[in-house]
């Protein structure tokens, strides 16, 4: 089976409409307020990180800019391949996700045969970090249906 958490990468709406929040058009605190149900959980203590850990953070942001800049956060070719996914698929969406909407996730379900969507309360775009127990329970329940 396949589990997708607040997926991005596909353009469903028209050319001038945003499917995915433009994180680069706002100050970081504003983005964090949209992405997290509790923005206080969002940022680690960078001053406590080792140089290796900080380099990892920088590499992650560099990769995001490289792969998500243009076209913004999607691959124009991806949507045409979604119908080929032929394994049971569960989409998980944080109820307070301001990065992608529930409708955006429902569009994914419409492209993947049999895919279903579940929400996780008190979570934003990163339910696996904000509500790890609820996230793990939903993944485990889904996995149990695969046997």
Regions found by a protein language model. Give the residues of each.
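Glycosyltransferase donor-binding loop in the core domain
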Residues: 70-73, 97-100, 124-127
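Short alpha-helix in the alpha/beta-hydrolase fold that links the catalytic acid
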Residues: 78, 87, 101-110
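Short beta-strand/loop motif that positions the catalytic acidic residue
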Residues: 85, 91-93, 97
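Flexible "cap/lid" loop of the alpha/beta hydrolase fold
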Residues: 1-30
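Short aromatic-enriched loop/helix-cap "lid" or pocket-rim segments at secondary-structure transitions
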Residues: 13-18, 103-105, 130-132
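Hydrophobic/aromatic beta-strand patches that form the interior of the parallel beta-sheet core
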Residues: 3, 90-92, 118
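Catalytic active-site module of serine/aspartate enzymes centered on a nucleophile-bearing elbow/loop
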Residues: 114-147
């Amino acid at each position: 089976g396949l589990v997708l958490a607040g997926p991005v990468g596909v353009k469903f709406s028209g050319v001038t409409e945003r499917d995915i929040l433009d994180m680069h058009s706002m100050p970081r605190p504003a983005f964090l307020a949209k992405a997290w149900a509790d923005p206080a959980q969002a940022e680690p203590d960078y001053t406590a990180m080792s140089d290796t850990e900080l380099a990892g953070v920088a590499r992650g942001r560099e990769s995001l800019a490289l792969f998500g800049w243009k076209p913004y956060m999607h691959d124009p070719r991806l949507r045409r391949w979604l119908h080929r996914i032929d394994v049971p698929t569960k989409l998980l969406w944080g109820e307070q996700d301001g990065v992608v909407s529930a409708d955006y996730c429902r569009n994914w379900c419409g492209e993947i045969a049999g895919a279903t969507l579940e929400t996780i309360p008190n979570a934003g775009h990163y339910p696996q970090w904000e509500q790890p127990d609820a996230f793990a329970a939903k993944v485990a329940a889904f996995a149990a249906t695969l046997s």
